[in-house]
């Protein structure tokens, strides 16, 4: 009897160990499944750089922050006061963090900042076509856009340049006498080597430089002012090698001051 009881107890313990081992074996598989699900999380659908489109999330709906900022810009435009509009992505939006410098340099123009972080050419084109230039006839638009397109593989150099061209056309359709101060896309990344984003920006700049007509479109490349002699980008100017800090914005202000004054007469 004792022998049978011992056998039964042994079998029970063996079953528990087996089940425990099976549970432990399941954990890595479950963890791996979680990682796989996370890795396969949906992303926002790709968009052509030269066709107007709002910024959307993975669900295909317009990004709420983008929509809110756009609506605020539409209201500013309705006032019809701004003689100069800065239009672009986070590098343009970054002027909001340099209010004293912005006021000092651009209050005389009643300047408006229409920069939105993360914007690409298609987003700026959509904004122009959807109210941001209704009721406003600025003397000058300072336009720089495209680095966020260059930072991804979705858009070709030609497509990005076409997107910029379409933005200029859309502006002039709404306010024909406005002059566009078209800034070359700023350099990005540490240096020239192994830097596809900078290489792509340079290629786009080579195309958009040809948009310059000396009348309504004025191409202006100030990129070299941010670079050291060896072509590297100092973190003292762009800490993340993409966005300007106060020193960087001062460099930009100094670089465009004379040209902007000339165009805004």
What kind of region is each of these model predictions?
Residues 111-114, 150-157, 192-195, 238-243:
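Second-shell loop/turn segments in exported
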Residues 72, 82, 86, 119, ...:
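Extracytoplasmic/secreted proteins, especially bacterial periplasmic and envelope-associated proteins
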Residues 187-265:
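Catalytic His-Asp segment of secreted/periplasmic serine-dependent ester chemistry enzymes
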Residues 83-88, 110-115, 139-145, 179-184, ...:
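Structural recognition of the beta-strand scaffold that forms the well-ordered cores
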Residues 77-81, 104-107, 134-137, 173-175, ...:
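Extracellular/periplasmic catalytic domains that process cell-envelope and extracellular macromolecules
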Residues 93-107, 121-165, 170, 181, ...:
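Oxyanion-hole/transition-state-stabilizing segment in secreted/luminal serine hydrolases
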Residues 51-61, 113-123, 151, 241:
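Acidic/histidine-rich helix-loop elements
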Residues 1-87, 91-104, 261-265:
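N-terminal secretory targeting modules
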């Amino acid at each position: 009897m004792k022998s049978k009881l011992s056998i039964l107890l042994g079998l029970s313990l063996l079953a528990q160990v087996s089940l425990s081992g099976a549970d432990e074996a399941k954990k890595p598989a479950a963890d791996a499944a979680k990682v796989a699900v996370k890795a396969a999380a949906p992303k926002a659908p790709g968009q052509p750089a030269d066709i107007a489109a709002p910024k959307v999330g993975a669900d295909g709906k317009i990004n709420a922050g983008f929509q809110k900022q756009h609506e605020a810009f539409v209201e500013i435009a309705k006032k019809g006061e701004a003689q100069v509009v800065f239009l672009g992505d986070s590098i343009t939006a970054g002027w909001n963090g340099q209010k004293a410098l912005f006021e000092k340099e651009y209050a005389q123009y009643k300047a408006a900042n229409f920069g939105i972080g993360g914007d690409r050419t298609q987003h700026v084109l959509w904004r122009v076509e959807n109210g941001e230039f209704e009721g406003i006839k600025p003397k000058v638009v300072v336009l720089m856009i495209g680095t966020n397109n260059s930072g991804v593989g979705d858009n070709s150099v030609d497509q990005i340049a076409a997107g910029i061209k379409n933005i200029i056309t859309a502006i002039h359709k709404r306010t024909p006498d406005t002059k566009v101060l078209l800034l070359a896309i700023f350099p990005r990344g540490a240096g020239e080597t192994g830097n596809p984003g900078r290489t792509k920006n340079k290629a786009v700049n080579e195309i958009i430089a040809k948009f310059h007509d000396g009348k309504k479109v004025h191409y202006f490349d100030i990129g070299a002012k941010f670079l050291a002699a060896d072509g590297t980008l100092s973190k003292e100017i762009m800490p993340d090698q993409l966005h300007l800090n106060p020193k960087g914005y001062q460099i930009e202000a100094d670089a465009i001051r004379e040209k902007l004054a000339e165009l805004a007469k």
